[in-house]
Amino acid sequence: MNGLLRIRQRYQGLAQSDKKLADYLLLQPDTARHLSSQQLANEAGVSQSSVVKFAQKLGYKGFPALKLALSEALASQPESPSVPIHNQIRGDDPLRLVGEKLIKENTAAMYATLNVNSEEKLHECVTMLRSARRIILTGIGASGLVAQNFAWKLMKIGFNAAAVRDMHALLATVQASSPDDLLLAISYTGVRRELNLAADEMLRVGGKVLAITGFTPNALQQRASHCLYTIAEEQATNSASISACHAQGMLTDLLFIALIQQDLELAPERIRHSEALVKKLV
């Protein structure tokens, strides 16, 4: 049996230390076959004895036999290579491994996003939201879904907020805005012409722009009164924006909780009342 296929088939039943080895071998088989057992142990973060035992659990006499199996597996792959489909996720990964890679990627994106935004900057953005007469939230595609979700939460705690995802309606809305209004634009790339045009118009009428966008300098950053940054590992060709959406969602949830903390007298009661109203529909 193909050595890589054998690892994939047994992956779900492996112990945690064995999964570390399996992850490394599945991700970098070409590198692994040139390593000694000690070198592989160091790379995977396990003991040398774990490497030998892992090879034996797979049915090989030892690590040299496993390396030979990896070489044979790689040699047989030219006609049907393992296709990368999203960052470290490959087309032939078991679903359990896909899930673990997604969790690792999304968690890393959320931690990186939290670390790049200072406490002071977060409080400044909370103040902007609390001071706004009306909050217009927008985004395109997946970012628009994050904007919609945040708008619903803001309304639950008494804010005059609305998500506008139709770009023609967005432009009509911002041109009729007042200096007390706030545009919250969510865009990982910050390059979409529609959003930047809306930001320009909001600034023209005297309003403010809060951007949730990527850390790489972009046009939306240049227009924003304040920025919160998202850090995510996204490929230029990837349209799913998986980790970016998790980072955006974490930031908006953080702002939501901060707003509740600053209105403990009324916000929790408003949430309960909103939930009670919804229950009447059932």
From Swiss-Prot:
Residues annotated as domain SIS: 125-265
An MF annotation (GO) of this entry: carbohydrate derivative binding
Keywords tagged on the record: DNA-binding, Transcription, Transcription regulation
Domain HTH rpiR-type: 1-77
Coiled-coil residues: none
BP GO annotations: carbohydrate derivative metabolic process; regulation of DNA-templated transcription
Stored InterPro entries: Homeodomain-like_sf, HTH_RpiR, RpiR-like, RpiR-like_SIS, SIS_dom, SIS_dom_sf, WH-like_DNA-bd_sf
Pfam families in the cross-refs: HTH_6 (PF01418), SIS (PF01380)
Keyword Flavoprotein: no
Domain of life: Bacteria
Residue ranges: DNA binding: 37-56
Protein name: Uncharacterized HTH-type transcriptional regulator YfhH
The encoding gene: yfhH
